């Protein structure tokens, strides 16, 4: 029995554990493992705390982002309203300006028509006076009624103008 290798391996193993027990290595080993477990628990608590803090920060940033988006939408809506108002004002101003220019053009056309009519009348009067002068001069003796002819022509000119 003492000659087998298994016996001596068992004896050495028991002796090794006895020496470890005598030097109280199991307590040191347990204390080290307990310390390591406490460190791991502390790290887990710190990780939970950091996770909660990160979730709070994320929620805060998401809320701020929603507020910023809402504010941006409000700004865009206000800009659209202002742009529509400006477009309406511009359209109204353009219509007023077109009406003014149309009225001015119509006035100029009416004035040009009146001027053209007056020019035609003046030309017709001059032609009529010239024709009347020639007809009267041909029918009336030049010496006898020259004064009458001149008087009639001046009256005719003033009446035609």
UniProtKB/Swiss-Prot annotation:
**Designated name of the protein:** ATP synthase subunit b 1
The gene that this protein is the product of is atpF1
Q: What is its main location?
A: membrane
The source organism is Parvibaculum lavamentivorans (strain DS-1 / DSM 13023 / NCIMB 13966)
At the top level of its lineage, which domain of life is listed?
Answer: Bacteria
Q: How does it sit in the membrane?
A: Single-pass membrane protein
Q: Which InterPro entries did the record assign?
A: ATP_synth_b/b'su_bac/chlpt, ATP_synthase_B_chain
Location(s) in or outside the cell: Cell inner membrane
What quaternary arrangement does the UniProt entry report? F-type ATPases have 2 components, F(1) - the catalytic core - and F(0) - the membrane proton channel. F(1) has five subunits: alpha(3), beta(3), gamma(1), delta(1), epsilon(1). F(0) has three main subunits: a(1), b(2) and c(10-14). The alpha and beta chains form an alternating ring which encloses part of the gamma chain. F(1) is attached to F(0) by a central stalk formed by the gamma and epsilon chains, while a peripheral stalk is formed by the delta and b chains.
